[in-house]
Amino acid sequence: MTSSYHQQLQAKIDRITTQFSEFTPPTLEVFESPEQHFRMRAEFRIWHTENDMFYAMFERNDDGKQKTVVRIDEFPIADKSINDLMPLLLAELKANSLLSQRLFEVDFLATLSGEMLVTLIYHRKLNQEWEQEAKALAEKLNIKIMGRSRGQKIVIGDDFVVEEFELLNRSFKYKQIESSFTQPNAQVCKKMLQWACDAAEGSKKHLLELYCGNGNFTLPLSLKFERVLATELAKSSVYAAQWNIEQNQIDNIQVARLSAEEFTQAYQGEREFRRLQEADIDIQSYDFDTVFVDPPRAGIDDETLKLLQSFERIIYISCNPNTLYENLKTLTQTHRVTKFALFDQFPYTHHVESGVLLEKI
């Protein structure tokens, strides 16, 4: 581990340990990232000059008011497959005016399983000639390509990749849709999944999961419970979760298209939802003892926090330590922290991903 990586990680460890000390958690478990090639997605602007074009990012000056263009020829934090493809793709784009004309952004989405989706974003309408050239390029480079411009989306191959993780003595396949959220650091994601499954060990009843996304945690956690009810509001994520459940041949998960707030209303009998009836989901048939949450950066609303306090165990993955801290002020009134983890999803940034297991006092 290099000194620069170690220093930034130690700074996060010190910050989190100090911030959460009032909750007297056990010793912090630390899950490191690879130092390079850990990001499975990358987005670049395309910068055109009179006789050249290149990948670019912008660097703001100290007061944040001015931006400087930074040429990017390689991107060490991105997966090796992205770095290998970058110069090959750029050379092909430069050599083809139909593909390079008014191209302003290129996005890469890679997987550990070897798939690659490249999105080319334009400031012009894409026509049939563009589509023919894009198909030829996709075949030549063995990649999937999407073309986007205002009001247009042209898919060459698929608009998704399929990731595959080995975990709990089996493999899990995940559909990752181009425009939907996915965990960017696949190696750390695997460590998060294993930690969550360890935290769930020993359950005798059912699992409720809020904010399930594409089923990233849902699939492996289903091996630890008799039944799982997962909720998610975004239609594209629900679709991906259902595809993932089917592809992985898992038969003990139901997905409800509800927000956390809506689930609370349904669970407490305050409101009926046609979406539940149409999906043949009877919430009252579940006997939950554990709830798993991976909320957005804003954390969990007050009504949902009250709901969580009724469960024996709460497994909470957080992408924002400040909202986790605020939520724990409420949750530790009824529960104690029995596991505490830091996942270095975003090395060399201030960002921290953390996990806590809370058990009823």
Swiss-Prot record:
<keyword id="KW-0949">S-adenosyl-L-methionine</keyword>
<dbReference type="GO" id="GO:0030697">
    <property type="term" value="F:tRNA (uracil(54)-C5)-methyltransferase activity, S-adenosyl methionine-dependent"/>
</dbReference>
<comment type="similarity">
    <text>Belongs to the class I-like SAM-binding methyltransferase superfamily. RNA M5U methyltransferase family. TrmA subfamily.</text>
</comment>
<comment type="function">
    <text>Dual-specificity methyltransferase that catalyzes the formation of 5-methyluridine at position 54 (m5U54) in all tRNAs, and that of position 341 (m5U341) in tmRNA (transfer-mRNA).</text>
</comment>
<dbReference type="InterPro" id="IPR030391">
    <property type="entry name" value="MeTrfase_TrmA_CS"/>
</dbReference>
<feature type="binding site">
    <location>
        <position position="183"/>
    </location>
    <ligand>
        <name>S-adenosyl-L-methionine</name>
    </ligand>
</feature>
<dbReference type="Pfam" id="PF05958">
    <property type="entry name" value="tRNA_U5-meth_tr"/>
</dbReference>
<feature type="active site" description="Proton acceptor">
    <location>
        <position position="353"/>
    </location>
</feature>
<dbReference type="InterPro" id="IPR010280">
    <property type="entry name" value="U5_MeTrfase_fam"/>
</dbReference>
<dbReference type="GO" id="GO:0019843">
    <property type="term" value="F:rRNA binding"/>
</dbReference>
<dbReference type="InterPro" id="IPR011869">
    <property type="entry name" value="TrmA_MeTrfase"/>
</dbReference>
<dbReference type="GO" id="GO:0005829">
    <property type="term" value="C:cytosol"/>
</dbReference>
<feature type="binding site">
    <location>
        <position position="211"/>
    </location>
    <ligand>
        <name>S-adenosyl-L-methionine</name>
    </ligand>
</feature>
<feature type="active site" description="Nucleophile">
    <location>
        <position position="319"/>
    </location>
</feature>
<feature type="binding site">
    <location>
        <position position="216"/>
    </location>
    <ligand>
        <name>S-adenosyl-L-methionine</name>
    </ligand>
</feature>
<feature type="binding site">
    <location>
        <position position="294"/>
    </location>
    <ligand>
        <name>S-adenosyl-L-methionine</name>
    </ligand>
</feature>
<feature type="binding site">
    <location>
        <position position="232"/>
    </location>
    <ligand>
        <name>S-adenosyl-L-methionine</name>
    </ligand>
</feature>
<dbReference type="GO" id="GO:0000049">
    <property type="term" value="F:tRNA binding"/>
</dbReference>
<keyword id="KW-0808">Transferase</keyword>
<dbReference type="GO" id="GO:0030488">
    <property type="term" value="P:tRNA methylation"/>
</dbReference>
<protein>
    <recommendedName>
        <fullName>tRNA/tmRNA (uracil-C(5))-methyltransferase</fullName>
        <ecNumber>2.1.1.-</ecNumber>
        <ecNumber>2.1.1.35</ecNumber>
    </recommendedName>
</protein>
<keyword id="KW-0489">Methyltransferase</keyword>
<dbReference type="InterPro" id="IPR029063">
    <property type="entry name" value="SAM-dependent_MTases_sf"/>
</dbReference>
<dbReference type="InterPro" id="IPR030390">
    <property type="entry name" value="MeTrfase_TrmA_AS"/>
</dbReference>
<keyword id="KW-0819">tRNA processing</keyword>
